[in-house]
Amino acid sequence: MSLVKPLTARQQEVYNFLKHYIETTGMPPTRAEISRELGFRSPNAAEEHLKALARKGAVEILAGTSRGIRLLLDAANDEPEGLPLIGQVAAGEPILAEQHIEGTYRVDPDMFKPQADFLLKVNGQSMKNIGILDGDLLAVHSTKDVRNGQVIVARIEDEVTVKRLERKGDVIYLHAENEEFAPIVVNLREQERFEIEGIAVGIIRNNAWM
C-alpha cells in the first residue's frame, strides 16, 4: 500500500513495535503498552502517534476497543493465498492431499473464526434448515477437537458428509438438518474408517455468511 507521506523515524519506530508485538502475541498492544515500551509520557502520546500513522495510511484505528489497531503497510503484498477447494476424496488419504484439491479460492482464512483451512462444496439439501444449501462452499476449520451439537465435516470410507454431531460413548450420530434425512449412525468399535475432518465455520454464497 502506498503512503501519502513517508513515515518519520519516530513513526517508523512505533510501526515496527506494533508489527513485532502483533507477530509475537497475536494481538495489537494497548496505548499504555506502546507508551511503556517506547518511553512516551502517557497513553495519549501513543494515541497521537497512532493517529498520525492512520493519516498516512499505515494503520487503521478500530473504534471501541483498546487493542483496535490494524496494520495496513504492505497489505497489498500480504494478500492471502486462498483456500483449497476439496473435491472427491479417496479412502485412506488425507483430505488435503494434492489430488483432492480442485482449485483455490482467494478468500482470507481469517474472515472466519476459528480460521478456515479449506472449502468443501455442499452436495444435497440435508442441512438446508440451517441455511447450508446445495452448491454452497462450506468453510472448514481442520480439527478433531469437536463437541456435541457442532456442525462437523466427517469422512466415512470415501464419503465426506456435513452433519451435526452427537456422540454417546462409542456411538456417533450424525444428524441432518432436514426432516427427510435419517441420522447416520457410526459405531466406533465396528467402523474403522471414520474420521472427523473439522468443523463448519462459514459458508460462501453471494456474500452470505453462516
UniProtKB/Swiss-Prot annotation:
Role: Represses a number of genes involved in the response to DNA damage (SOS response), including recA and lexA. In the presence of single-stranded DNA, RecA interacts with LexA causing an autocatalytic cleavage which disrupts the DNA-binding part of LexA, leading to derepression of the SOS regulon and eventually DNA repair.
Chain's gene name: lexA
GO MF annotation list:
DNA binding; serine-type endopeptidase activity
Active-site residue list: 126, 163
Entry keywords, A to Z: Autocatalytic cleavage, DNA damage, DNA repair, DNA replication, DNA-binding, Hydrolase, Repressor, SOS response, Transcription, Transcription regulation
As for family, the record states: Belongs to the peptidase S24 family.
The identity of this protein, by name, is LexA repressor
**Pfam families named in the record:** LexA_DNA_bind (PF01726), Peptidase_S24 (PF00717)
Species, as recorded: Actinobacillus succinogenes (strain ATCC 55618 / DSM 22257 / CCUG 43843 / 130Z)
